[in-house]
A protein has these predicted regions:
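Sec-dependent signal peptide recognition
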Residues: 1-7
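Phosphate/nucleotide-binding beta-alpha loop and adjacent structural elements of enzyme active sites
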Residues: 10
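Sec/Tat signal peptide C-region and signal peptidase I cleavage site
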Residues: 13-17
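N-terminal soluble domains immediately following signal/targeting peptides that reside
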Residues: 18-149
Length: 149
């Protein structure tokens, strides 16, 4: 009985720890013609009122050794809580897209690396808070170092 109570307690704790976050996908997943040319699409998860969530995105890059920052427009799709990010940063250099979201009193963040063939899902990082500048720097450094190997 004690094991059962402990298991239920652990499940409840992990369920409460799972808060507002993002899920990223290919632009064809949008199933809306105007968004199929986007760099990627994403949706909010575990947001009670997704239409009221506030989302911002910035492309952070290193081009010819210099740091660049490009504010991005986040385009809402017809389904509440689903958004597209179009590539408005240059083709040169290495880039990550930094997402920040607020849903009621919860925040979420993500760092989405962009490679020559598009976003790199397996290297993307998700946070229960906005990504820290040091985390963005580390992601960019990893991408640049990967080029030199």
């Amino acid at each position: 009985m004690l094991r059962f109570a402990l298991a239920i307690s652990l499940l409840a704790t992990s369920a409460m720890a799972d808060g507002f976050t993002f899920t990223i996908g290919n632009s064809v997943a949008a199933q809306e013609a105007p968004f199929k040319s986007a760099a990627f699409v994403f949706r909010t998860e575990r947001c009670a009122e997704p239409a009221k969530s506030q989302i911002t995105a910035t492309a952070e890059g290193i081009v010819h050794g210099a740091r660049r920052s490009v504010p991005l427009k986040v385009s809402a799709l017809q389904r509440p809580g689903v958004y597209a990010v179009f590539q408005t940063w240059g083709n040169e250099g290495r880039w990550v897209v930094v997402l920040k979201g607020v849903c009621q009193n919860e925040t979420a963040g993500a760092i989405v690396p962009i490679g020559p063939k598009g976003f790199i899902r397996e290297s993307s990082k998700f946070f229960p808070r906005p990504a820290a500048g040091t985390e963005v720097d580390a992601s960019l450094k990893t991408m640049v170092e990967g080029d030199s190997k």
